[in-house]
Each structure stands twice: as structure tokens, then as C-alpha cells.
Amino acid sequence: KFTLRFLFTPLVHWPETMITYLEEEEIMFSCDAFGSYGSLDGVLFDDEAKDQLPFYEKEALRYYTNIVAAFSRNTLMAIEKAAAYPFKIIAPSHGLIWREDPMRIVSLYQKWAEYATKPTEPGVTVLFGTMYRNTERAMEACLQTIKSEGVPIEVFNVSTVHPSFMLPSLWTKKGVLIACPTYERAMFPAMVHALDIAEIKSVKNKIAGYFGSYA
């Protein structure tokens, strides 16, 4: 005999999302909550991937910022519901199954969800676009100044990097620097797309700067 409890956790990230709790085995089948990107490459559980955990945790952050971040309030509510039950295993629909240290992924999700309203990490995310390298040269001068202050930086060329790889840095870092030229009297199209995605994913409350050149 097995007993399943269904914990309604709407908008993590679908309206009908539920966590299914198997009482006898203390397993949380958490659906999209606590999931991650990343090919499992022959492993299934966290204890089988110890050497690869930094990769999977990085991919979990990328998954969070792309799939769940816009619903961070709901994520915190889901964590609170799950905490009411003892669990030995977290088994999400995507990514590693956490059986050795299930609280590891729960604590990471808690931290990332709280970034929606609480202070984030020191550092600057730099998004740049360039056509004739004029904006890029100006950006390089800015980067030297920021680096001289010991501030962590991540730099993304919006013309060559998919926005899904920009979002983790945008979500976790306190500062954003945007550098791009104009394009026919408007913002560089690739930058428009990157910023639209950031807005959709609820990236906000940042210290931001902007500069560019015109054509």
C-alpha cells in the first residue's frame, strides 16, 4: 500500500502544477520545482554526479531564471508547503534526482526566489551590442574601470549569446550595464530582444547604466 498526497503549487510554473508526496518512502515528486537543465550524461542522482555538481547547479540556476523566476513568490509558497512534510528524496520532472542532499537544491531555490525582492550578489552584468566596434571599444574602457574596483563582471554579446545564458547573471547580480548603438533611430534590435526577455522574467531592482554610439 502506498499513500500519495497532492500539494497544489500553482504557477511553479504552470497553473495546474502539483507536488506529489509519497508518504511511505518520503519522496517529493516536485514537478517543475527544483528542476534543472543539463544532460544527465549517464547519471540520475546527485550522489552519482559529485564531480559534476557545479555544472548541474549552474544549470539549475539557468533553469530557474528561464522557467521559474517570474513566479518566485509562488516558488517560496511551494517551498513552505513542501517543508511541512519530511522528505528523503526530491525528484523533479527535469534534471537530477536529489537523494543524498535534497536540501541542497531546496536551499538554492530558496535563495534564488528571494532575489526577487531581496538584495542580490555584488557584481555587474554587461550586455553589449556593436556594429562597427565603436560601442565595444567604449565598453572595454568601462570594463577596465569596473575591474580596477574589484567588482565581479560577466560580459555578454547580445548578438551571439542566447538570452537564456544571460538571465542567470542578470538575476543574481546587483548591477547591469547596457552598451549598444542605435539602429535606424531606435535601440539595437538584439538588445531590444534581450531586455524584453529580462522584463518577461521579472528581472528588476537593479543598479543600471546605459551608453552607446549612434549610426
Label for each model-derived stretch:
Residues 139-154:
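Short helix-loop-beta junction
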Residues 161-215:
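Helix-loop-strand module that forms the ligand-binding subsite of alpha/beta enzymes
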Residues 89-123:
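Terminal amphipathic helices with adjacent charged low-complexity linkers/tails
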Residues 10, 107, 156-161:
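Short gly/ser/thr-rich secondary-structure transition/capping motifs
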Residues 3-92, 97-100:
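Metallo-beta-lactamase
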Residues 30, 93, 127-129, 156, ...:
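Short hydrophobic segments within beta-strands
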Residues 4, 27, 124-126, 208:
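Conserved hydrophobic helix-helix packing surfaces used for dimerization/oligomerization
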Residues 135:
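Glycine-rich phosphate/diphosphate-binding loop of Rossmann-like nucleotide-binding domains
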